[in-house]
Amino acid sequence: PGGTIFERPELGGISGLAADLLTAGTKRHSESALLTGLDAGGASVSVNAGLNSFLIECSCPRRHFARVFRLLKEIVATPAFGQAEFDREKANRRELLKSRAMSPRAAAEDRARMLMFGGHPYGWGAAGTLPQLEGLTCELAAEYYFSRLVPEQTIFGWGGDCTEAEAREWTEELAAAMPWRGERITLPEQPVFPSGPRTAAIPLPREQTMVLTAVPGPALGGELYSMCEILFQAENGLASPVFKLVREEHSLAYSTGMRLSGGFHPGWLLLYAVTAAETAERALELLEQERRRLAANGLSPEEFNSAREGAAFAAARAAESVGTALNSTLLSLHYGRGLDECFRHEAELRAVDREALNAALTPYLSHPSPVQIMAGRLPNRKEV
């Protein structure tokens, strides 16, 4: 139970900072010795803190598994959380946030999050904010990580060259090494969305301008997950309606697309375009035009059929990859869904009906309180 949604306001961004520190040394091995040992075993270890989850992944050749597993146990059970490594990673995060503030795309999305979600954790996103970062300490990062280790909310998964008996044995061994905590982690209150439209203009010394329009969306961990995947597939890529409208028909953007956000709690549906200052206002109008079209008419039969096929193909490919299937299965269980969802997902997507999809998503796409952002080089009359 980690990730942004489980952070308190004063700890925004701490999940990502803790994730960076897990592979920066253990109680027994320095960072250099740990990385050397993993490299000698041909291992790849990644720790990812997202909006709704905290995921530790490790892969290696079977012949090196025993030695790598010993190091993995140290990483998850006895990470060092050294002060020097913390200071380094905090400095890296500080530079990341400063870089985001100067990027039209990142700055626009970060401001949109704040306006859309307010004080809910989704409002500060996975990176957190600079004021939140400055309040974080090494002790807080360590306590946050260890407080996540709740047995009934932790999921272990194994895949590849192993038997079920071996997987059970490794699970028991890893569980025995964990410094478990007993207090169950609970979700915060759901976000309260704006009662009216919100807008912002962010001047930045860049040549390009990012424009976006966003409306409240469904919880992506829920029953609308497959429908949102099809909508996402439809509105991204060179054949998407928004690309054809904004770029091909009006030559107003370098790139366009749709972003989805959410998970345990409702998130957003966001349409964006990267354009120039002179065409930013018109590009934003066209994004709103596309949103209203989707709200009124939904995806056309051609758009729907193509998008559903693309989403189903991606699901089939994911089920064929051990790593991707294992990752998807763990997240499915994390959200309280079925163990075999990854292997049923292609069929679930193909079973989605166009009229049902359009009817289900219309209330979100027609929401009366969009958030609209313009960031980068602005039209002359635009001010913050």
What are these regions (language model features)?
Residues 1-23, 29-78, 90, 94-96, ...:
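M16 family metallopeptidases and their MPP-like homologs
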Residues 168-172, 180, 206, 213-214:
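Acidic, glycine-rich loop-and-beta core segments that form the ion-binding/anion-interacting portion
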Residues 44-47, 142-149, 259-262, 360-364:
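Short, flexible, solvent-exposed loop/turn segments with mixed acidic/basic and small polar residues
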Residues 66-67, 164-168, 223-224, 278-283, ...:
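Short, conserved charged micro-motifs
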